[in-house]
Amino acid sequence: MPSALTASEIREAFLKFFEERGHRRVASSSLVPANDPTLMFTNAGMVQFKDVFTGRETRDYRRATTSQKCVRAGGKHNDLDNVGFTARHHTFFEMLGNFSFGDYFKADAIAYGWEFVTRTLGLSTDRLAVTVFNGEGGTPWDEEAYELWKKQGVPAERLYKLGLKDNFWAMGDTGPCGPCSEIHYHQGDDIPCVEEAEGKKCQGVACDCDRWLEIWNLVFMQFERKEKDGPLIPLPKPSIDTGAGLERIASVVQGKRSNYETDLFQNILATVSELCGKPYSQESGASQRVVADHSRAAAFLISDGVQPSNEGRGYVLRRIMRRAIRHGTQQLGLEDVFFFKVVDRVIELMGDAYPELRESRTFVLEVCRHEETSFRQTLSRGLKLIEEELSELQKAGGKQLSGDVVFLLHGTYGFPWDLTQIIARERGLDVDLVRFEERLKEEADKNKFAGSGDKATGEVYLKLAERLGTTEFLGYEGEGHEGEGSIRAIVKDGAEVTQATQGDTVELVLDRTPFYGESGGQMGDTGRIVGHGGKAVAKVTDAQRPVPGLVVHSVEVSEGTFKVGDMVQAGVDSERRKSIRANHSATHLLHKALKLVLGEHVKQAGSVVAPDYLRFDFAHFSPATSAQLEQVEDLVNGWIRDNAGAETRVMSLEDAKKSGAVAMFGEKYGETVRVVTVHPESTELCGGTHVRRSGDIGLFKIASESGVASGVRRIVALTGIGALQHVREQEHELRKVAELLKSNPKEVSKRVEATQKRVKELERKVEEVAVKAQTASSKDLLEQARDVNGMKVLATQVDAADDNVLRGMADQLRDRIRSGVVAIGGEKDGRAIILVAATKDVVAKGINAGALVREMAKEVGGKGGGKAEMAQAGGPDASKLPAALEKLYELVKGVGTA
């Protein structure tokens, strides 16, 4: 029975259906779009085929079917606040799709779609309706699709014509576009409709209510728009792009009114219910739905290499995770760290369909555990700070919390702005979101989301790629340092020109080149291009790939003239290339060694392969110990000494993955890939240049290991001569230190320890002398004490600028005053320092040094705190220190009269 089909069975049935009809089953691409700076996340099945549809990429198949991982959260698809409170909104979902690249068109697409929903899924034709484009804006209505649907047996009364908004699709302002048809399923007229609630008529398939549920969209790419608002030009080979949300289809097949009632979510919701001890219900389970939905998004995003952070994709992930954690802690009462347990259930349930979840399980769970632990601390600090700010605002009679405060909470403490808004509203206060968004924009302008491309893709390069195709790379064969090619294009200041003469700085595009264009972290080559028998010479300063497959040479013409069509000799700086090869191969070995030493969860998070160093970013939470780094070095150097022959094989992407080759995060691979084995221990997909034998690397030395973001570590390392020079420099420094300490290198550490101990002893003695000198006149200071409400209060500024000296003075004056409060102020580098100390008897009467110093700190523009008997504060405005100290008397008086 159709109702018995699970979501997994529906997914497999869809893919198998189209496989049997000549479609290639293609694996889901990453949620991080490769080489597409326009998208934050993959949000549709066609994303991985965008270049195929535009003709920039060709594949060895013309029909494809996929189950694509998608995330819609952030940008124009930001429905995050609705997730959990509606039946359909999700952050993560699966898009089933079938695609034709200039092969079949409307007739087959419509026939396939109708056959699958009515025969394979067994949906009743009486509950199905279809929409077609009605014609608008000068574009004719889709009569062809209308007639084809009728041919399938769809009656005219269930064929609806809708406009551009609903039934016309475009990739952007320019590019492929065309009408579309949507298949809708009737769930029942008893479902509430907003239109009817307002006294209007339900709009049926065009209504936003759920009576008619869209389950499949078939896009007919039959036009192309060359320029914005330009005419639609018929494509010579129209294509098909369809998308069906698995969650929606599962709800229909399983007879559920909500996606959350399907088996995709019920098992996850059961885990949430078990953790919080509250039974799930559709009516009261909003917070449980939030946790269930967000756990799916977190699992898939982290497994695809996204890390929680305060910018770009990482910030969207952080917001998703923290929203789930907040609902778990505040609404569901989950006191212990819980989110990673829900995510683990997601991995268990979906790991068969998406093996990458299981492969990265350890790391995914650690990221979730770490983020929740951190956020729980943030939540506590943030709640305390916002409480202070709101109390101050209400005391002053204010009605709106400043957007600057919201930004401070958001940026400094990672506190969600929407939570700040909720808390403010509970107090009857508004939030200045306009100012908050201004601050966000200012921050975004400083660090704009750059996408996954290394350089901005200029229109000129897109046009060149369309016209010229890919550049043939000669660098893999032989030494790969030299080659002959023809100049296909010359670009100057972003525009094509026909020639370049002496003194010009331009970019050359050749049909064939030995120059490696920067990609995959490997820097571009440098060298020379010579033409006209040596009469024209250009220095190549860089080689880039602004568009996949197109190599652009940045050159400075030093002699003669180069023209489009000239044959030239291109020569790479061979020594520089040799160093890059060594560093690139060493990067592969380093990656493998890190996995062996730190764990299989280690994933590359970025790299730079330069001639003089290599930099490798990887997913790992804690700093690697010295012993671990030594172990990594030993492994890599051992593999280098093995002098194993490096091997490069060309195979299909599918075969490469089956062979166990490691794919790099963020890289886009074609159907045919290069698989590089530097040593039997290391096999990776890679298009870069490498050594012939592992021994060619020479020597490997780690120069540094550090953290660059939460859960991301960075290693900088050197190879060959560079590594040797690094070791020698360290030796020279060690000898210098030994000479200064009048020791030998082996005894340096002992001598340094002894010296440090001596320095600390001297510092202690100096501090004692300073305190004695400052307190020698304490008798005079005590005479300045005032009587406030029967207790002695002293606030004074001294010349001491050391925290410890001020603390010592405060201690001594408190002892001498016997009963009362003392405040000592000092200045250091223009900043104010304030120490407040209170005797035990006045603390018992309600005096609190921490509360006093917090109020005093506001005068100097700072903050402070501490215990009831001793507290400290600091602030940037030392000029207001006298006013801050004077405020103590007023504050104590207020306590005494309270």
Curated annotation (Swiss-Prot):
Residues annotated to bind Zn(2+): 584, 588, 686, 690
GO term, biological process aspect, one: negative regulation of DNA-templated transcription
Main location: cytoplasm
Keywords: Aminoacyl-tRNA synthetase, ATP-binding, Cytoplasm, Ligase, Metal-binding, Nucleotide-binding, Protein biosynthesis, RNA-binding, tRNA-binding, Zinc
Superkingdom of source: Bacteria
Swiss-Prot/TrEMBL cofactor(s): Zn(2+)
EC number from the UniProt entry: 6.1.1.7
Function noted in UniProt: Catalyzes the attachment of alanine to tRNA(Ala) in a two-step reaction: alanine is first activated by ATP to form Ala-AMP and then transferred to the acceptor end of tRNA(Ala). Also edits incorrectly charged Ser-tRNA(Ala) and Gly-tRNA(Ala) via its editing domain.
Domain remarks: Consists of three domains; the N-terminal catalytic domain, the editing domain and the C-terminal C-Ala domain. The editing domain removes incorrectly charged amino acids, while the C-Ala domain, along with tRNA(Ala), serves as a bridge to cooperatively bring together the editing and aminoacylation centers thus stimulating deacylation of misacylated tRNAs.
This protein's name: Alanine--tRNA ligase
Origin species: Myxococcus xanthus (strain DK1622)
Designated gene of the protein: alaS
